[in-house]
Amino acid sequence: MKLINIWLLLLVVLLCGKKHLGDRLGKKAFEKASCPSCSHLTLKVEFSSTVVEYEYIVAFNGYFTAKARNSFISSALKSSEVDNWRIIPRNNPSSDYPSDFEVIQIKEKQKAGLLTLEDHPNIKRVTPQRKVFRSLKFAESDPIVPCNETRWSQKWQSSRPLRRASLSLGSGFWHATGRHSSRRLLRAIPRQVAQTLQADVLWQMGYTGANVRVAVFDTGLSEKHPHFKNVKERTNWTNERTLDDGLGHGTFVAGVIASMRECQGFAPDAELHIFRVFTNNQVSYTSWFLDAFNYAILKKIDVLNLSIGGPDFMDHPFVDKVWELTANNVIMVSAIGNDGPLYGTLNNPADQMDVIGVGGIDFEDNIARFSSRGMTTWELPGGYGRVKPDIVTYGAGVRGSGVKGGCRALSGTSVASPVVAGAVTLLVSTVQKRELVNPASVKQALIASARRLPGVNMFEQGHGKLDLLRAYQILSSYKPQASLSPSYIDLTECPYMWPYCSQPIYYGGMPTIVNVTILNGMGVTGRIVDKPEWRPYLPQNGDNIEVAFSYSSVLWPWSGYLAISISVTKKAASWEGIAQGHIMITVASPAETEAKNGAEHTSTVKLPIKVKIIPTPPRSKRVLWDQYHNLRYPPGYFPRDNLRMKNDPLDWNGDHVHTNFRDMYQHLRSMGYFVEVLGAPFTCFDATQYGTLLMVDSEEEYFPEEIAKLRRDVDNGLSLVIFSDWYNTSVMRKVKFYDENTRQWWMPDTGGANIPALNELLSVWNMGFSDGLYEGEFALANHDMYYASGCSIAKFPEDGVVITQTFKDQGLEVLKQETAVVENVPILGLYQIPAEGGGRIVLYGDSNCLDDSHRQKDCFWLLDALLQYTSYGVTPPSLSHSGNRQRPPSGAGLAPPERMEGNHLHRYSKVLEAHLGDPKPRPLPACPHLSWAKPQPLNETAPSNLWKHQKLLSIDLDKVVLPNFRSNRPQVRPLSPGESGAWDIPGGIMPGRYNQEVGQTIPVFAFLGAMVALAFFVVQISKAKSRPKRRRPRAKRPQLTQQTHPPRTPSV
């Protein structure tokens, strides 16, 4: 009976233990996904924004009370005819303080009232109120196969789909992997990221983020979450009456920064300030962010994490407020975006100079596929983008706090961003002289200490991987100074300096522009003293290059730019070799104390330059890319070129050879062509230097002077290759949509390309495109091709070569959901100008085969064949003798495509006057003129290796000695078949803190083991008591054998 009771007791203990473990595993499984297949899905957090009709943000020149703001608006509107207006109340924690903006509602559509407001001396700007949406969407985790539906199905959202990048991806949100480097399953393994970056070394030195105020702008945080002990304040900026996190994203971000147990954060003792700026329906407004930003300034926040972003770097109220935040010493850390591996996909505000933009890597130090790539596109078309991201860190499979406790693993740059924010918070707590900490000094320490990843260019990794301990060493001995990003220019260093290293420079070429960021750790404002100085090294042929400068007149806040144009002197037109020199700039900032009357702090920085020069290539090998006539979002609604890609409605990557046409550029370079970029009108280049002008996906209009000059250039030997795209006003009206939230129609400003403008350009040669819209797969010259939402050729000279194909009428499918097949659609035309020495013209109706954004089948082979034709006059036999060659269309009876009535292209065009009515061109702008710097030659040898870790002045890392602590590193076990990615990875325990995960798991198994052992001994004792006693037999005397010692056998 006792034995039965013992076994019953053991069974109860085992069942209780099984239930306890099952509850924990079930909770994790629920947090991971709600369906068994979720480990194979991705849940993308996408952002979109709309303009709220009738609502406007009125920004003032200073901070005023509510009464004063009301008075300013009332007096401004008094003289106008606007009567139906009101100030929208904002009930949030900042309502009791002065503000620099107001939200008003004007029900009348007259713009006179807005203009009257802007005329008021205390009003800075009036901009539309924007509504921000965040949506969670499951999709296949394989990003290679694009969304390509076989039948048209128009499913517009009720908000303007200005696509915001996925900044949070995780198991539970998304499952992500890094780059597949070999033929094996590569999973994002959840890690204790704080200890992987050796934060435990600083913990054991006594630094845990104490006395540092860190703000998390996200979805809120529950009041009694077990992971946080120092939540100083929770504020709600939404229209919902709750402070709790109903989604889990804000909890996760806060946990990565400051969790004190289980999945430990970097700075558990930091003061957490939680700003709930998104509702449970994932909606926010620009005004909510502005109020919250103002409150963050008021609360003297030290570090602010913003794990959101989007492509709209022209949302002026938001951008201006970010500048104001950093000017008030708030260190902002923001996610760079999840639109990789495509280039030119950086998100705002992470692409701003004063913000630390963070990209993502996996735990094998591969750039995460989802991480957005540079360059910035603010500067196009006339300039060149800056280096971003600033640094990269772990963003795939990172563990953080669950919404109700426990841990979960997420991936995305919105995960990498709080990793850096947490590291910065920890670093700030180590600095004794807190007055030295500012957005510039922290950024300088991070990029100077970053570890460069091999085989990765600067537009993927920035300055490299976050190195927490080296950053600590730098900050510990930091002295205020200026620095540069990048810290040197080496156009021979590949792959890091791609694309600069991909093409040497030569005489007569377009100047190479390098956009350098100046970081000023001495003060929020600064200036460049005198002018930058160019000092060529004579022994290294530095006198063979010349440089010109453009730079910020004022460095604010904490930063500015230095644009360097590099060109080759005439004497080196036939020379080949390496040329070197350096630029010297001196930055000055006002002294902080008023006692120093007019005193300034100064810092002099050297920027080494190294370039490779070759003799000027022949004209036939030089291709000029037209950048000036490409338009993008922001600010206009320029639709995608492939209408099948409804999940990416905007053309926002810049259409540059180093962004979404990167693969095409790489191919042309591999074929021996030299590609230059024209960021000015056609009147600003010497056509005798180039064999082909390449115009791809052009949305801009043309000056009359450009049309006349291009005709002369083609007559004199310049060839023209045009890749067009769809344009159809009926389809444009169809793809407009009604926003139910704003009760407003959104209309494209043009089609995929501006066909009416192109036809005006081509009319002198009797050529033109139609407004037909076609799609389909076909074969040409034994190559598989795909025509994605392209147009056809409407007319072409009779002595030209025209290739036709059979396609589906996609326009009919869009407009009427009907399917029809059209034969003999003219898509490719080749024409030789009959005049002696004339050039050649090629037309093709679709650019998607060159564009990296949604390319399904490339047509690089066709581009090669066309350039052979335009450069050397050799018509490819595969085209001239093709069975698809047809008689060129005459265009008789076809009405040319017209510009859509009421379009707003004039608002964003560099060519058209900004007014309604018939389009009229502006006056032709002057061509850019560079003022070359006067050289100050140096008769000394240049340094042989320009790549060093960016050494800040007066910093000696050897003086800052780190203690030799033995820290536990997370152990990784291999992935079993069918196992999910949400693993429990053992990690070290923070000194002085109880690891709840280990504390929950180990006692359970210890208790079960003790009970099993106890039961075993009880059973043995019971058996022994019930066994009858035996008389011990007398021991027998052993018999002697001949073999006294056993044989020796080898021990194993």
UniProtKB/Swiss-Prot annotation:
Residues 1023-1052 are cytoplasmic. Glycans are attached at residues 148, 236, 305, 515, 728, 939. The active site is at residues 218, 249, 414. It comes from the Eukaryota. The keyword Ubl conjugation does not apply. Changing residue 249 to F: Loss of activity. Keywords: Autocatalytic cleavage, Calcium, Cholesterol metabolism, Endoplasmic reticulum, Glycoprotein, Golgi apparatus, Hydrolase, Lipid metabolism, Membrane, Phosphoprotein, Protease, Serine protease, Signal, Steroid metabolism, Sterol metabolism, Transmembrane, Transmembrane helix, Zymogen. The record marks 186-187 as: Cleavage. Residues 190-472 form the Peptidase S8 domain. SUPFAM superfamilies: Subtilisin-like. Inhibited by divalent copper and zinc ions, but not by nickel or cobalt. Inhibited by its prosegment, but not smaller fragments. Inhibited by 4-(2-aminoethyl)benzenesulfonyl fluoride (AEBSF), a serine protease inhibitor. It is a single-pass type I membrane protein. This is Membrane-bound transcription factor site-1 protease.
